[in-house]
């Protein structure tokens, strides 16, 4: 196991204990032991070195004291800050984003997952090769270069940008294939339920408990990166597809969000979402709020059941309140029958047919309707485009609007 000095910049005293514990868990997952911890209270990072000058000197003394050559910073460094710290301290410096990327690289198993991780790492490293020009000799003209004046640094940058473009094209092709599979699932009429939650909340354990899937379930952060799809038959005989997704984390690095966009978007295919929360985590409320915020940002508009998992680890009973909430233990099976009942109650199994007139200005919706619902008929009228579609009520409400659903069926909002 690698050993490191861990350094934090404390911008928010209230959040610091939670952020500290989470970063130490990330390091443990990565296989790095925190030998010592140092922190500095500052409202904002110092532009050049992240920490103040005096604190940097103190960090250097601790590194020498413990004979360490690795500094792990519990925040995100700019390329300049990372370079300056490495030059001053003469050790390897890694930040929070880099640790997360290394964990992702270890846990990516599918072709898509590996592409996404490579894309994120290249986007992270591209701005960090700046400054290498001082130590790289200049190249003469040759194949792949633009002439005798091009440096190795410029060639490296160009190579990385080219690879990033290739990876983005590959991901686009994978996304198109996913859309084809999604259309087939829709034609089959099998509803989709997505498992989402903070990393290490127990989503994979729950997937295994419900379906016997045998998916890797470890007490590690980001143990699951690749979406896993499994069939589930409810007690009433209804069939559905259950999808496990990559775990969320507070302040998810933007480049990871971009690289894993297509994976995260899988929640938009779902008729129902199970938000799995680690009910025994002391920072449960903070983690729950992070996931809810991300779902809001993603404009998720389907029912969400909050599943408080790991309640068997609680020293004493806790009352979890909520209209769509259930406390369970995926490990022991506690309350799993109640969870299945809630899934049945919240999924609208009956397929309905809706006829609605769209204004011509909303003609762009036709593509979404064809892709996500059964488009039975389409007719152009003087007042707009009349469409007849069939599908689950919630999905129709999502793409046509609940008002259109109510007008067509004479129903009240659910």
From Swiss-Prot:
Its cofactor is Mg(2+). HAMAP family: GTPase_HflX (MF_00900). Keywords: Cytoplasm, GTP-binding, Magnesium, Metal-binding, Nucleotide-binding. Pfam families: GTP-bdg_M, GTP-bdg_N, MMR_HSR1. It comes from Carboxydothermus hydrogenoformans (strain ATCC BAA-161 / DSM 6008 / Z-2901). Disulfide bonds: none annotated. InterPro entries: G_HFLX_dom, GTP-bd, GTP-bd_M, GTPase_HflX, GTPase_HflX_N, GTPase_HflX_N_sf, P-loop_NTPase, Small_GTP-bd. Mg(2+) binds at residues 204, 224. It is found in: Cytoplasm. Belongs to the TRAFAC class OBG-HflX-like GTPase superfamily. HflX GTPase family. Residues 191-351 form the Hflx-type G domain. One of its GO terms (molecular function) is GTPase activity. CDD domains: HflX. Monomer. Associates with the 50S ribosomal subunit. SUPFAM superfamilies: P-loop containing nucleoside triphosphate hydrolases. One of its GO terms (cellular component) is cytoplasm. This is GTPase HflX. Signal peptide: none annotated. GTPase that associates with the 50S ribosomal subunit and may have a role during protein synthesis or ribosome biogenesis. GTP binds at residues 197-204, 222-226, 244-247, 309-312, 329-331.
């Amino acid at each position: 196991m690698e050993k490191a000095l861990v350094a934090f910049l404390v911008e928010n005293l209230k959040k610091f204990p939670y952020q500290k514990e989470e970063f130490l868990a990330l390091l443990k997952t990565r296989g790095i032991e925190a030998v010592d911890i140092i922190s500095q209270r500052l409202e904002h990072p110092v532009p050049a070195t992240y920490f103040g000058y005096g604190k940097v000197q103190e960090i250097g003394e601790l590194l020498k004291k413990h004979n360490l050559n690795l500094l792990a910073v519990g925040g995100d460094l700019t390329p300049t800050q990372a370079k300056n710290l490495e030059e001053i301290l003469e050790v390897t410096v890694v930040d929070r984003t880099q640790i997360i990327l290394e964990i992702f690289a270890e846990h990516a198993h599918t072709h898509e997952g590996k592409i996404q991780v490579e894309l994120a790492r290249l986007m992270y490293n591209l701005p960090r090769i700046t400054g290498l020009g001082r130590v790289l000799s200049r190249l003469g003209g040759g194949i792949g270069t633009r002439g005798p004046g091009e440096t190795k640094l410029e060639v490296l940058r160009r190579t990385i940008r080219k690879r990033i473009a290739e990876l983005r094209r590959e991901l686009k092709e994978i996304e198109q294939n996913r859309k084809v599979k999604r259309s087939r699932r829709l034609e089959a009429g099998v509803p989709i339920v997505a498992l989402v939650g903070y990393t290490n909340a127990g989503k994979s354990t729950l997937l295994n408990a419900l379906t016997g899937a045998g998916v890797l379930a470890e007490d590690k952060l980001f143990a699951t990166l690749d979406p896993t799809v499994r069939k589930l038959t409810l007690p009433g005989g209804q069939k559905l597809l259950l999808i496990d997704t990559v775990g969320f984390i507070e302040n998810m690095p933007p480049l990871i969000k971009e690289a894993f966009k297509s994976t995260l978007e899988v929640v938009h295919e779902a008729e129902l979402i199970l938000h799995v929360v680690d009910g025994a985590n002391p920072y449960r409320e903070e983690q729950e709020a992070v996931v809810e915020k991300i779902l809001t940002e993603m404009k998720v508009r389907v029912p969400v059941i909050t599943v408080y998992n790991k309640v068997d680890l609680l020293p004493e009973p806790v009352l979890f309140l909520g209209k769509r909430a259930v406390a369970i233990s995926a490990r022991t099976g506690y309350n799993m029958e109640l969870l299945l009942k809630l899934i049945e109650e919240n999924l609208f199994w009956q397929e309905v047919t809706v006829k609605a007139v769209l204004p011509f200005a909303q003609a762009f919706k036709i593509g979404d309707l064809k892709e996500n619902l059964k488009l039975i008929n389409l007719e152009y009228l003087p007042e707009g485009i009349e469409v007849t579609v069939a599908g689950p009520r919630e999905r129709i409400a999502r793409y046509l609007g609940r008002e259109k659903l109510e007008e067509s069926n004479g129903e009240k909002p659910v």
